[in-house]
């Protein structure tokens, strides 16, 4: 059910084709496409915000309180362009970035990174071991359901490290995935119509004084 909302977008983890010819009609067509894309973006993000959960935390039978996300001001959204960490530090920014990656079918990267962040905060050796195995089976091993793109040597090292799990088991892989997102997905997110719309300041309404 959840994945069905994202099947209308491109699958190649790259920007959409912007070619739509030239001339007034083509310009009108492009503007219509942009409005449609922006509307789809807002629908996807709204759905994602209502149904998102931390990938590092297991789901329980109890109903969890819905997370509250406050839409940023244009000035706050513009800060996300200064550094990738600024985007990740914002709850709304992180949720928007996750929705963006999901629309490009690349969400495994941010989900792995978040799972590693949760993993590093774990204190109990028993929980550390069980979480390490889950991250490995979800993201690392061959044909994992959310397999990330890392080299064979790093995968082998992780397989050895999780036998006696420590908080640094996934450090190398997490750094590589972070770098991949920072240099690839992050710039495309900043160019997306959704992000550009967040940065736009609403037009000021001026009222003319009544003639006396």
UniProtKB/Swiss-Prot annotation:
Keyword Cell membrane: yes
Compartments it resides in: Cell membrane; Cytoplasm; Nucleus, Nucleolus
Pfam families with a match to the protein in the record: RGS
Molecular function in Gene Ontology: adenylate cyclase inhibitor activity; G-protein alpha-subunit binding; GTPase activator activity
GO biological process, one term: negative regulation of cardiac muscle hypertrophy
Region Disordered, residue ranges: 11-33, 48-69
Keyword Cytoplasm listed: yes
Region (Necessary to inhibit protein synthesis) residue spans: 79-116
RGS domain sequence ranges: 83-199
Alphabetical UniProt keywords: Cell cycle, Cell membrane, Cytoplasm, GTPase activation, Membrane, Nucleus, Phosphoprotein, Signal transduction inhibitor, Translation regulation
Highest taxon above the source species: Eukaryota
PROSITE patterns recorded: RGS
UniProt-annotated stretches for the region Necessary for membrane association: 32-66
Post-translational modifications: Phosphorylated by protein kinase C. Phosphorylation by PRKG1 leads to activation of RGS2 activity.
Gene Ontology terms: cellular component: cytoplasm; cytoplasmic side of plasma membrane; cytosol; nucleolus; nucleus; plasma membrane
Gene3D superfamilies attached to this UniProt entry: 1.10.196.10, Regulator of G-protein Signalling 4, domain 2
Complex formation: Interacts with GNAQ. Does not interact with GNAI1 and GNAI3. Interacts with EIF2B5. Interacts with PRKG1 (isoform alpha).
Task of the protein: Regulates G protein-coupled receptor signaling cascades. Inhibits signal transduction by increasing the GTPase activity of G protein alpha subunits, thereby driving them into their inactive GDP-bound form. It is involved in the negative regulation of the angiotensin-activated signaling pathway. Plays a role in the regulation of blood pressure in response to signaling via G protein-coupled receptors and GNAQ. Plays a role in regulating the constriction and relaxation of vascular smooth muscle. Binds EIF2B5 and blocks its activity, thereby inhibiting the translation of mRNA into protein.
Official protein name in the record: Regulator of G-protein signaling 2
């Amino acid at each position: 059910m959840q994945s069905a909302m994202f099947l209308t977008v491109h699958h190649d983890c790259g920007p959409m084709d912007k070619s739509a010819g030239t001339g007034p009609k083509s310009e009108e067509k492009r503007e219509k496409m942009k409005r449609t894309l922006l509307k789809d973006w807002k629908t996807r993000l709204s759905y994602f915000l209502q149904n998102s959960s931390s990938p590092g935390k297991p789901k329980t039978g109890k109903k969890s309180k819905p997370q509250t996300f406050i839409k940023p001001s244009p000035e706050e959204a513009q800060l996300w362009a200064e550094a990738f960490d600024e985007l990740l530090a914002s709850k709304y920014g992180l949720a928007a970035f996750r929705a963006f990656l999901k629309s490009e079918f690349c969400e495994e990267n941010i989900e792995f990174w978040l799972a590693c962040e949760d993993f590093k905060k774990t204190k109990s050796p028993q929980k550390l071991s069980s979480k390490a195995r889950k991250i490995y089976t979800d993201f690392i091993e061959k044909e994992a359901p959310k397999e990330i793109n890392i080299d064979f040597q790093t995968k082998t090292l992780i397989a050895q490290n999780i036998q006696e799990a420590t908080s640094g088991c996934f450090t190398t892989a997490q750094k590589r995935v972070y770098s991949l997102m920072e240099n690839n997905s992050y710039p495309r997110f900043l160019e997306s119509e959704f992000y550009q719309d967040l940065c736009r300041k609403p037009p000021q309404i001026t009222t003319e004084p009544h003639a006396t």
